[in-house]
Amino acid sequence: AATVGLVSAAGVAMERKSANTGNLKGNINHSVCRWCYSKIPMEDFLQSLNELGITAMDLTGPEDWPLMKKYGIHASMCWGAGLGIEKGWNDPKLHEELIKDYLQIIPKVAESGYTNLICFSGNRNGMNDDVGLKNCADGLKQIMPLAEKHGVVIQMELLNSKVDHKDYMCDHAEWGVALCQEIGSENFKLLYDIYHMQIM
């Protein structure tokens, strides 16, 4: 049986100063999501991250990575393939395009020294959850050999379907765990977002 991996979204934690030295301990690694700050020019944003001691950024693609490397900011959760949140792996009609996109981006993620690559189930659009799970597994299994070869971990994000992402299929941990078990690869995991899951 596959080991089910749950990866928490970037945590928001207070980094305390050492009482003796006044220096940061450096044992908490902060990450930020780029889309939240998209109005700030990238280079200005990266400079600010350096000043704040933040070491990583989520949801960035190949066009961002060279500048991120210049400032020593790690791409903790990559994107660069797919059709967005609503159109995902649960729709077999999209598999050909999704597979093509992911097979192109997986080597780029690895060559750039990164590990994690996000994916989405897509919306239900009237589809039964069991059917959607099988569809996701059938499609994702076709990219897993390349992900395994390159050491890239494909991660499907759990999102709430009550407030922010109405009709999204991967909206419960149980469904996501079942998908991990069906795929059966250590290189497929869940991106467990505590904001979204506490709503469900």
Language model segments and positions:
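Acidic (Asp/Glu)-rich catalytic clusters
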Residues: 21-26, 46-51, 64-80, 104-114, ...
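Mid-chain, structured segments of secreted extracytoplasmic proteins
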Residues: 73-101
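Active-site-proximal loop/turn and secondary-structure-junction residues that shape catalytic pockets
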Residues: 36-38, 61-63, 81-83, 123-125, ...
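Short, acidic/polar
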Residues: 38-48, 61-64, 95-107, 199-200
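Hydrophobic faces of well-ordered beta-strands that scaffold small-molecule active sites
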Residues: 28-34, 57-59, 75-80, 117-119, ...
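Active-site acidic/histidine proton-transfer and metal-coordination neighborhood
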Residues: 5, 91-192, 199
